[in-house]
Amino acid sequence: MNIQTIARAACTAMAFAIAVPAAAHGAAETVTPNFQHAIPNIPGKSLTAVVVDYAPGAASSAHRHAGSAFIYAYVVSGEIESQVDDGPKRVYHAGESFFEEPGAVHRTSRNASETTPAKLLAVFVADTNDKVLTTPIK
Protein backbone atom coordinates (compact mmCIF):
# COMPACT_ATOMS: atom_id res chain seq x y z
CA MET A 1 0.00 0.00 0.00
CA ASN A 2 1.50 3.34 -0.97
CA ILE A 3 1.07 6.72 0.72
CA GLN A 4 -1.43 7.96 -1.91
CA THR A 5 -3.71 4.98 -1.31
CA ILE A 6 -3.56 5.53 2.44
CA ALA A 7 -4.22 9.26 2.01
CA ARG A 8 -7.22 8.59 -0.28
CA ALA A 9 -8.64 6.06 2.19
CA ALA A 10 -8.20 8.51 5.08
CA CYS A 11 -9.90 11.33 3.14
CA THR A 12 -12.79 9.04 2.21
CA ALA A 13 -13.23 7.95 5.84
CA MET A 14 -13.20 11.58 7.03
CA ALA A 15 -15.73 12.63 4.40
CA PHE A 16 -18.03 9.80 5.49
CA ALA A 17 -17.67 10.71 9.17
CA ILE A 18 -18.48 14.35 8.44
CA ALA A 19 -21.51 13.54 6.28
CA VAL A 20 -23.11 11.07 8.69
CA PRO A 21 -24.53 13.68 11.11
CA ALA A 22 -26.85 14.77 8.30
CA ALA A 23 -28.71 11.44 8.33
CA ALA A 24 -31.58 12.53 10.62
CA HIS A 25 -32.21 15.84 8.94
CA GLY A 26 -35.11 16.35 6.56
CA ALA A 27 -35.22 17.79 3.05
CA ALA A 28 -36.23 21.27 4.24
CA GLU A 29 -32.84 22.00 5.78
CA THR A 30 -29.30 21.70 4.49
CA VAL A 31 -26.48 20.14 6.51
CA THR A 32 -22.98 21.14 5.41
CA PRO A 33 -19.87 19.47 6.84
CA ASN A 34 -17.58 22.16 8.23
CA PHE A 35 -14.70 20.46 10.04
CA GLN A 36 -13.50 17.05 11.27
CA HIS A 37 -10.28 16.30 13.11
CA ALA A 38 -8.92 13.89 15.69
CA ILE A 39 -8.18 15.55 19.04
CA PRO A 40 -4.45 14.89 19.48
CA ASN A 41 -4.32 15.18 23.28
CA ILE A 42 -7.45 13.04 23.82
CA PRO A 43 -6.71 9.69 22.18
CA GLY A 44 -9.75 8.11 20.56
CA LYS A 45 -11.79 11.35 20.39
CA SER A 46 -12.59 13.52 17.37
CA LEU A 47 -14.17 16.91 16.82
CA THR A 48 -16.75 17.24 14.03
CA ALA A 49 -18.64 20.40 13.10
CA VAL A 50 -21.61 20.81 10.75
CA VAL A 51 -23.67 23.83 9.73
CA VAL A 52 -27.44 23.30 9.58
CA ASP A 53 -29.31 25.83 7.42
CA TYR A 54 -33.07 25.88 8.04
CA ALA A 55 -35.42 27.35 5.47
CA PRO A 56 -38.31 29.34 6.98
CA GLY A 57 -40.51 26.94 8.96
CA ALA A 58 -38.19 23.96 8.34
CA ALA A 59 -37.61 21.27 10.97
CA SER A 60 -35.39 18.26 11.58
CA SER A 61 -36.85 14.87 12.41
CA ALA A 62 -36.50 13.71 16.01
CA HIS A 63 -33.10 12.07 16.40
CA ARG A 64 -30.47 10.75 18.79
CA HIS A 65 -26.73 11.21 18.59
CA ALA A 66 -24.00 8.64 19.21
CA GLY A 67 -23.71 7.50 22.83
CA SER A 68 -20.24 9.03 23.06
CA ALA A 69 -21.16 12.37 21.45
CA PHE A 70 -21.23 15.62 23.39
CA ILE A 71 -22.89 18.29 21.23
CA TYR A 72 -22.51 22.04 21.50
CA ALA A 73 -24.97 23.93 19.30
CA TYR A 74 -24.62 27.63 18.48
CA VAL A 75 -27.30 29.67 16.69
CA VAL A 76 -25.46 31.63 14.01
CA SER A 77 -28.52 33.47 12.67
CA GLY A 78 -32.28 33.47 13.07
CA GLU A 79 -34.14 31.61 15.81
CA ILE A 80 -34.10 27.86 16.52
CA GLU A 81 -36.70 26.09 18.66
CA SER A 82 -35.19 23.08 20.42
CA GLN A 83 -36.27 20.39 22.86
CA VAL A 84 -33.79 17.85 24.22
CA ASP A 85 -35.11 14.74 26.02
CA ASP A 86 -38.09 15.68 28.21
CA GLY A 87 -36.85 19.22 28.84
CA PRO A 88 -38.92 22.23 27.89
CA LYS A 89 -39.07 23.56 24.34
CA ARG A 90 -37.02 26.75 24.09
CA VAL A 91 -36.34 29.27 21.35
CA TYR A 92 -32.66 30.19 20.98
CA HIS A 93 -31.75 33.43 19.22
CA ALA A 94 -28.63 34.28 17.20
CA GLY A 95 -25.63 34.25 19.53
CA GLU A 96 -27.18 31.78 22.01
CA SER A 97 -26.15 28.16 22.45
CA PHE A 98 -27.21 24.89 24.03
CA PHE A 99 -25.65 21.53 24.93
CA GLU A 100 -26.77 17.94 24.36
CA GLU A 101 -25.58 15.11 26.62
CA PRO A 102 -24.38 11.85 25.02
CA GLY A 103 -27.32 9.70 23.91
CA ALA A 104 -29.90 12.47 24.44
CA VAL A 105 -32.98 12.53 22.22
CA HIS A 106 -33.34 15.77 20.25
CA ARG A 107 -37.13 15.82 20.01
CA THR A 108 -37.52 19.26 18.41
CA SER A 109 -35.09 21.19 16.24
CA ARG A 110 -36.72 23.69 13.93
CA ASN A 111 -36.63 27.19 12.55
CA ALA A 112 -38.92 29.20 14.84
CA SER A 113 -39.70 31.64 12.01
CA GLU A 114 -42.01 31.08 9.05
CA THR A 115 -40.41 33.97 7.14
CA THR A 116 -36.68 34.14 7.96
CA PRO A 117 -33.98 31.45 7.46
CA ALA A 118 -31.97 30.21 10.46
CA LYS A 119 -28.49 28.74 10.78
CA LEU A 120 -27.05 26.48 13.49
CA LEU A 121 -23.46 25.33 14.04
CA ALA A 122 -23.33 21.89 15.72
CA VAL A 123 -20.02 20.74 17.17
CA PHE A 124 -19.63 17.06 18.13
CA VAL A 125 -16.95 15.64 20.41
CA ALA A 126 -17.25 11.87 20.01
CA ASP A 127 -15.33 8.63 19.88
CA THR A 128 -13.32 8.54 16.66
CA ASN A 129 -14.72 5.06 15.93
CA ASP A 130 -18.35 6.30 16.09
CA LYS A 131 -19.09 6.69 12.40
CA VAL A 132 -22.86 7.17 12.77
CA LEU A 133 -23.26 10.34 14.81
CA THR A 134 -26.99 10.93 14.19
CA THR A 135 -29.80 8.36 14.09
CA PRO A 136 -33.48 9.19 13.37
CA ILE A 137 -36.04 8.19 16.02
CA LYS A 138 -38.70 5.96 14.50
What are these regions (language model features)?
Residues 68-87, 94-96:
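Glycine- and acidic-residue-biased ligand/ion/polar-headgroup-sensing regions
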Residues 39-44, 54-56, 86-103:
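Short acidic-glycine-tyrosine-enriched beta hairpin
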Residues 1-11:
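Bacterial N-terminal signal peptides that target proteins for export
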Residues 20-27:
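Sec/Tat signal peptide C-region and signal peptidase I cleavage site
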Residues 58-61, 81, 98-111:
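Histidine-centered metal-chelating micro-motifs
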Residues 29-62, 68, 123:
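A short glycine-rich, His/Asp/Glu-containing loop-to-beta-strand
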Residues 9-19:
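Bacterial N-terminal signal peptides
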